[in-house]
UniProtKB/Swiss-Prot annotation:
Family: Belongs to the universal ribosomal protein uS8 family.
The name this protein goes by in its record: Small ribosomal subunit protein uS8
Position of the signal peptide: none
Function: One of the primary rRNA binding proteins, it binds directly to 16S rRNA central domain where it helps coordinate assembly of the platform of the 30S subunit.
SUPFAM superfamilies cross-referenced by the UniProt entry: Ribosomal protein S8
Keyword DNA damage: no
Organism: Psychrobacter cryohalolentis (strain ATCC BAA-1226 / DSM 17306 / VKM B-2378 / K5)
Entry's Gene Ontology molecular function annotations: rRNA binding; structural constituent of ribosome
Top-level taxon in the UniProt lineage: Bacteria
Quaternary assembly: Part of the 30S ribosomal subunit. Contacts proteins S5 and S12.
Any single biological process term in GO: translation
GO cellular component: ribonucleoprotein complex; ribosome
Length: 132
């Protein structure tokens, strides 16, 4: 059976791994997952994201999680737009997360970017998830 919501699965894997105090989490790779993971690395929520090729041409994305004084750096990570209800917003309607202390991940025509970058570029898109 095929997976319907790959981004939701990715966010759930990260959330579950952090609750279990795991060092890293592995998942099947895709371009969208890799770009979201790179954004999380750039924003400082995870330590690194590496794609490895398996022997049967299946790429695996491994995300190394970040902890500070025994607590996970990511306080909340939640899906906003979902396959059954897509949430598209214009540049003026992109929501802020925790009064600017968190990040909204936005899928735009120019790629995956944060809410701040999308507002600065003057473009809207699909609000994929919230991270704080």
């Amino acid at each position: 059976m095929s997976m319907q919501d790959t981004v939701g699965d990715m966010l759930t894997r990260i959330r579950n791994a952090q609750m279990a105090n795991k060092v890293s989490v592995a998942m099947p790779n895709s371009k969208l997952r890799k770009s979201i993971a790179d954004l999380l690395v750039n924003e400082g929520y995870v330590a690194s994201a590496v794609v490895t090729e398996e022997n049967n041409n299946k790429a695996t994305l491994t995300i190394v999680l970040k902890y500070f004084e025994g607590k996970a750096v990511i306080e909340t990570i939640q899906r906003f737009s979902r396959p059954g209800l897509r949430q598209h917003r214009g540049k003026d309607a992109i929501p802020t997360v925790k009064q600017g202390m968190g990040v909204a991940i936005v899928s735009t025509s120019q790629g995956i970017m944060t809410d701040r970058a999308a507002r600065a570029a003057g473009i809207g898109g699909e609000v994929v998830a919230f991270v704080a």
